[in-house]
């Protein structure tokens, strides 16, 4: 799975709303997840994963992670979930305006579809899901977060599961 070429790490930093994903063991109850990236010295990206637990009015939770940028490409990171494990984290799609992105793994076990805003145009979202499918992911495993879930509800072309998250 190829990472994007010529990623400008400075432009990539900031807030990214998770619109859809394949849930991990660490985010099963996550509602309205947000990833925030901040560059730190030594090729490190400080990552804050925040979300509401269980429902949109659930308690706010936050996890602090570290991304270690690969020497081979700024679009490939080792994301340290807990020491000493670093999970593969690849920016596999990024639009020219740095407004939408797809993060994937060569194992195709997890994927994140993200945007700078909590929701995007349904046609753009559908195209992103199609890209996820083209990358080899099973769309039946995709969890769509609100508010994209409501906007996507009438889509019958792509079969991504909607969840209460």
Model-derived regions: residue spans:
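A beta-rich soluble binding module of mature secreted/lumenal proteins
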Residues: 1-165
């Amino acid at each position: 799975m190829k990472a994007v070429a010529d990623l400008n790490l400075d432009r990539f930093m900031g807030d990214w709303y998770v619109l859809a994903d394949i849930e991990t063991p660490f985010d099963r109850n996550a509602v309205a997840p947000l990833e925030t990236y901040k560059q730190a010295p030594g090729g490190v990206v400080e990552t804050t994963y925040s979300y509401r637990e269980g429902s949109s009015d659930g308690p706010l939770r936050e996890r602090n992670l570290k991304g270690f940028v690969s020497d081979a490409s700024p679009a490939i990171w080792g994301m340290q979930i807990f020491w000493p494990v670093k999970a593969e984290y690849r920016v596999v799609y990024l639009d020219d305006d740095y407004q939408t992105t797809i993060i994937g793994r060569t194992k195709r076990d997890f994927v994140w579809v993200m945007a700078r805003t909590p929701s995007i145009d349904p046609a753009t979202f559908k195209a992103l899901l199609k890209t996820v499918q083209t990358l080899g992911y099973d769309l039946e495993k995709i969890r769509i977060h609100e508010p994209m879930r409501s906007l996507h509800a009438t889509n019958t072309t792509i079969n991504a599961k909607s969840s209460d998250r």
